[in-house]
Amino acid sequence: MELQVVGANALTVSETTFGREFNEALIHQVVVAYAAGARQGSRAQKTRAEVSGSGKKPWRQKGTGRARSGDIKSPIWRSGGVTFAAKPQDHSQKVNKKMYRGAIKSILSELVRQDRLVVVEKFEIDVPKTKVLVQKLKDMALTDALIITASLDENLFLAARNLYKVDVRDVQAIDPVSLIAFDKVVVTVDAVKQIEEMFA
């Protein structure tokens, strides 16, 4: 199959990478797993056994008129332990390489079908200035875009840092969430070739 390159001849690409059927269930599973893996999972609370303090009974069981109490670390006391204390946990989900690659290829294929994948000969700016990048995107009628280059362009990266709806990645850093998060995905010809090699 062929991809139209802006201002240049069409680029012949692999049908297996850019012409796959849309597999919604697979993409959903991989995106959920990716998001779960990004969770910090480091929350930690103390049970009554872990709270620092004396284990002495505050007052005798009977005869004071007060409610019976055996421990100042009781969950119903101020500064006591937590009844069902949260503990650090790993939220990551296992995704096979074959599934991950399949999801990426399915997303790329769907981007092609929806005319959301824009292939350009090259995408670069001379200075790391946000206004220069904004003007370049404006010339291409783009406002919400992920820019993928073969290797990370420092000028592009610095210029895009202050733009909420623009992100710059190299091929090694693409992921399923970022591919579906933007209206358009701008890819250089060299990046397309790298993607084909990676996901062949």
From Swiss-Prot:
Residues 43-71 are annotated as: Disordered. It comes from the Bacteria. One of its GO terms (molecular function) is rRNA binding. Keywords: Ribonucleoprotein, Ribosomal protein, RNA-binding, rRNA-binding. GO terms for cellular component: ribonucleoprotein complex; ribosome. GO terms for biological process: translation. Part of the 50S ribosomal subunit. Belongs to the universal ribosomal protein uL4 family. One of the primary rRNA binding proteins, this protein initially binds near the 5'-end of the 23S rRNA. It is important during the early stages of 50S assembly. It makes multiple contacts with different domains of the 23S rRNA in the assembled 50S subunit and ribosome. This is Large ribosomal subunit protein uL4.
